[in-house]
């Protein structure tokens, strides 16, 4: 942080303390203050972003009612849209570091809202990259982060539950971000209509002005080098061989031969959130 800016740091402004507050209004005030801080393009350290995500994780943990959970799962990833490239990259990396570290501590009653948080975060990652005109250097930094954390092919400490969820949602959220859709699969039930309009049909036209090969690189690495045969098969079948890659973007992913089935039963596919 620049010299003389200590009086305007996250801690001095009380933002981190607000995020960890016991009452919801104070936590929400902390989120609003963080958004304003990000908009100001103040330089934030990696360590401070880890503290930020510790607080934001707590905000999500403490949110119980279904509508409030949906709102919070959208609000937190939306902070990406107001950050500059440098802060956005640190925001992305510390989110995934936090989620991968805390995942095994999330109980069954709370896991669905964190699945929804991940879905919205992936969506907002693509939206933010679109805002930057899919600048290749930024895309590469973010795919490196995905390869290091949720889609790491060799780190056994990363739960497969995160990998399965990423396989489930990745192409869906890429499609919605590219087509400009504001609605995720999980939030369709809360919209006023689900009819397909002419505008929706037009939005499905092919757009190939983004580096799709680089965006898919983490899954190619996972499919080639992953330790779990089930994860590798699903990465190939549900991401790299997704028909939308060809039909919408005229892209053919490298052909990776699925591992032989040696008798392991595939994991039962979880209902999408």
Where do the language-model regions lie?
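HEAT/HEAT-like alpha-solenoid repeats
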Residues: 7-16, 43-59, 88-99, 125-147, ...
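Eukaryote-skewed repeat-based solenoidal scaffolds used as protein-protein interaction platforms
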Residues: 76-188, 210
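Eukaryotic acidic, Ser/Thr-rich intrinsically disordered low-complexity regions
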Residues: 2-19, 152-153, 157-158, 165, ...
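Helix-start/N-cap signature of alpha-helical segments
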Residues: 4, 19-31, 45, 49, ...
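Long, low-complexity, highly charged intrinsically disordered regions
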Residues: 1-75, 79-82, 108-110, 249-255, ...
